[in-house]
Amino acid sequence: MNYEQAMEYIHAVQWAGHKPGLTRTRTLLAALGDPHKQLRFVHVAGTNGKGSTAAMMASCLQAAGYRVGLYTSPFINRFNERIQINGVQIPDEELVKLVEQVKPAADAMEDVPTEFEIITALGMLYFAQQKCEIVVLEVGLGGTLDSTNVIDAPECAVITALGMDHVKELGPTLADIAAAKAGIIKEGCPVVSYGGVPEADIVIRRVCAEKHAELTEVDFSRLKYEGGSLDAVEFDFDGLTDVHLPLIGSYQPRNAALAITALRVMRTHGWNIPESAIRTGLETVSWPGRFELLRHAPAFLLDGSHNAHGMRATVQSLKDRFPGQKFVFLVSIMADKDVDQMLSLLAPLAVRFVTVTAHTPRAMPAEVLAEHIRAYGCRAEAADSIEAGVARAVELGGEGPVCALGTLYFSGDVRNAFAELVKG
């Protein structure tokens, strides 16, 4: 088997679909010797900020001297990004070996696993074989029935900012969504929650009480944040002063405060994480595709916000970093998202929109999205391809800023198309 064949196997149509439940993952992992039972975890659930928070925690734990696995989704440029150790993506040849190990077990299952369940098994196997001391594990969707939730009590369960998303799968209210995320809380494990949403906080507090889990809610009154530049945001949090965070979204200091709080809780439970490692980890973290500046002047930004809750944070960041400026937006949005709410947030900042169709069946067709946008009185045109869309947005932007956003699923293609365009 080569890398292309391994990828074909992982993405094969027979695994397609979303089927909640843990039985298949347990069956698959049992056939592989239960690698997850050899590992210790930080488990991260939430609506927005999961990936950024997970990346920050992994970076800090690595700076503290630990061998750290990081499991995230989706990827931006290459699949291998989803499974990393100490900031290094899984090598192609290792991935091929793992697929060869997982394939017989998956093929033998009557209730076929989903693609995400197969990837979870690959990650667990790799982290165990490579003897990771701690794995930062990002939930795929929800919590309770997500395949990552096969693990026993984590070293820390982290719940990031909550908002309305995936309501079809998780339920129509914030309380429903909080209940799904709170599914990662296990008996007696420390829990750190972003908080700030009363109807969700009630649910998380109740579950913690039921599970005898010690809950810490982030004290954002201790976060001092004066703004930032296009290179870094600077903040103080609870005694850690003048941190220069290279993730420049205005929402990132709050994610960092969550990560810091969780790391300090872990320290009280025996993990050796000095403040100096937290600072180093935060100041060297890399997390592409989240309010990422691909070019300074004229500015070209790439952002992964893909629901109204995330879009609100991105719009605030655009106002903070580019006061008084209007944007050409390059947009693709999944058809199952709150499209109108997202567009209503963007419209006041827009000079013009260029729409494209991301390479996923869930994407709203570019022309349909353009029609939606025109309903807001904005000028919008659909491009035939992501490459054409990037070129057109840059042309329309002229000397002004361009921002590509609406889904993480086109981030890699946008980044590559922009690099080609600039290269000429």
Residue ranges and their predicted role:
Residues 22, 26-37, 63-152, 170, ...:
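ATP-dependent carboxylate-amine ligase catalytic core
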Residues 110-111, 118, 131-138, 154-242, ...:
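Acidic, Mg2+-coordinating active-site environments of NTP-dependent enzymes
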